[in-house]
Amino acid sequence: GFDENIPRILKEGQGIEVTEGSWEILPVFRFLEKYGRIAHREMFNIFNMGIGMVIALPEEDAAKAVAILEGYGERASVIGRVTDREGVVIK
């Protein structure tokens, strides 16, 4: 999930701030959260809320990376930013 996997791609002392809603969250995840009575934050650790892969790169390269991925037929979104505070924060 987010809390274990994303920090592994970052340098020591870094974390990530994820902006919820910056990608399409499929209805199945809302269904599972509601009817499975799963805490909202826990959904990010169990199901990644539909995120299949995270790539961390310099902010100035983000738009180009999204364009390249979309050029290959992939859905891509900028979902957050790297911070100088360890851990994963979801806003």
Residue ranges and their predicted role:
Residues 1-91:
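Glycine-/charge-enriched secondary-structure boundary and capping motifs
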